[in-house]
Amino acid sequence: PAVYHALTREDLESRLAKTGGTPYRCASVKTALGGDVQLPASAINAMRRDVLAQLTAQRGRVKPARLHPYNALAPYDGMTGEPQLTVSVRSASQITARMLALRPTVLYVPLAEILANPDLPGRLGVETQLAAVLPRVTWSGEDRQLAAQLREVYALGVRQLLVGNLGQLKIAKAAGFAVRGDFGLNIYNSRSMQYLRAQGVDSQLLSFELTLPQIRDISKAVPSEVLVYGRLPLMLMENCVIKNRTGTCACDAGVTKLVDRMGEEFPIVKDGGSCRNV
């Protein structure tokens, strides 16, 4: 005659935990058995397979897309008249009399360079606005130092900042500066331009990847700038490759270069007053 054994907690948990050949792993099993329960192993296995099949079916369901009404963008016409010249320099030594004679509308200078040359604001004509360029990356641990530098440059008469990431918008506004957007914001479409307008940004350098027709058609919710001459920054590195290579801080000793297998040279410079490399 057949011999029946009562189902034990250990037997039940062992069979339910068998998920081999499936993408699942059983982390734990909770059981509640009362009395002498008898259940064939085949029934337990079938129950486990059914549960896993239901789980797979739930995972395969596609959530319906959330649709929102399309809101047409408000039209903004671009500036009329001749384009205005804005100039960005890496060091104060690049600010020559010949360059100032061009009467740029805005001159962008790294924050650290302005602090190192406090006479710079007084050297510019009334037709040229001076904007301090913030480092593209600032860690939260640098906030106190940055705040002190902003107070110092504000005392020198600087009232505009060029910011390269969205996190700096709040910092700049809180410090009382007008804000201009740098290429790091990667503005590529009209909705982004209108967002910047809502955030109080005064101008925006458009993405390098835009074509001339795209530049023409993008919303002019804020005055737009395009880079027409100069080197394009390829990447930003947290660690100073110059110091790691030479063992000394030599950013100001000359231009360091990377050379690829085709012989192309890529200058490496520091990002503002930081030890990060561009």
Pin down the residues of each PLM region:
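Active-site pocket-lining/capping segments in soluble small-molecule metabolic enzymes
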Residues: P1-V278
